């Protein structure tokens, strides 16, 4: 198969990262978690007491992705591995706000485009098919019900030892959907040439197989 790029977009907790990792593994491609980039910048924003000088924040930031056999993708922020801090509730509650800021978006998109230049990339996020990789060979827009997405996030938090309330997670996801879809810069939307894939009630294996079947049709 020729080298291709795959873009997976969709709202929070639609299963993008889980599926992107699995697809990348099955196809021996490189997985790039763009959400982790925005989470890392949000982590720094919180460490800086919620600074509003986002241009200065990114100007004084180094951000790299590395891969370790035992952890997979790791996020190195200012020479520190911050991977284990990126899923805490405080970061989750602020990431949409930070990611909506133009300096932050420009900084991250530039890095994402650089990573995908050689192809062979599976990338997931909110604006991959519309902004980062508009020429991706396959674009999939993943959706799921709010209830299922909240349940996934709740179980994920449990595994990570993060305390959370199911109803609060539902409200947070609904609020984040509205924010992501209505922000001025790179709003969440389906690319015109993307395939919609509803993952509600489906297993990881079922969704992965559906995407692999789409890949097999690429000439």
UniProtKB/Swiss-Prot annotation:
Domain of life from the UniProt record: Bacteria
Keywords associated with the record: ATP-binding, Cytoplasm, Kinase, Nucleotide-binding, Transferase
UniProt xrefs under Pfam families: Cytidylate_kin
Enzyme Commission number(s): 2.7.4.25
Keyword Cytoplasm: yes
Subcellular location: Cytoplasm
InterPro entries from the UniProt entry: Cytidylate_kin, Cytidylate_kinase_dom, P-loop_NTPase
Catalytic activity reported: CMP + ATP = CDP + ADP; dCMP + ATP = dCDP + ADP
Molecular functions per Gene Ontology: ATP binding; CMP kinase activity; dCMP kinase activity
Nucleotide-binding found in the keyword field: yes
Endpoints of the signal sequence: none
One of the GO BP terms on file: nucleobase-containing small molecule interconversion
Enzyme class: transferase
Transmembrane segments: none
Residues the entry annotates as binding ATP: 10-18
Any single GO CC term annotated in Swiss-Prot or TrEMBL for this entry: cytosol
PANTHER family linked: CYTIDYLATE KINASE, CYTIDYLATE KINASE/PANTOATE-BETA-ALANINE LIGASE
Family in the record: Belongs to the cytidylate kinase family. Type 1 subfamily.
Entry protein name: Cytidylate kinase
Source organism per UniProt: Staphylococcus aureus (strain MRSA252)
């Amino acid at each position: 198969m020729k080298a291709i790029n795959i873009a997976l977009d969709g709202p929070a907790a639609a299963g993008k990262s889980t599926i992107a990792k699995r697809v990348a593994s099955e196809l021996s491609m490189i997985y790039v978690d763009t959400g982790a980039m925005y989470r890392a910048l949000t982590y720094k924003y919180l460490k800086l007491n919620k600074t509003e000088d986002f241009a200065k924040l990114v100007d004084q930031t180094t951000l790299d992705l590395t891969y370790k056999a035992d952890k997979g993708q790791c996020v190195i922020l200012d020479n520190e591995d911050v991977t284990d801090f990126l899923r805490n509730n405080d970061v989750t509650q602020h990431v949409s706000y930070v990611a909506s800021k133009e300096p932050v978006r420009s900084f991250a998109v530039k890095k994402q485009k650089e990573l995908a230049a050689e192809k062979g990339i599976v990338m997931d996020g909110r604006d991959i098919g519309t902004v980062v990789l508009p020429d991706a060979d396959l674009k999939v827009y993943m959706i799921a019900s709010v209830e299922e997405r909240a349940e996934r996030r709740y179980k994920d938090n449990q595994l990570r030892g993060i305390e959370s309330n199911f109803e609060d997670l539902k409200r947070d996801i609904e609020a984040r959907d509205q924010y992501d879809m209505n922000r001025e810069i790179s709003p969440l939307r389906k690319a015109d040439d993307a395939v919609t894939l509803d993952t509600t009630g489906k297993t990881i294996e079922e969704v992965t197989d559906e995407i692999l079947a789409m890949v097999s049709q690429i000439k």
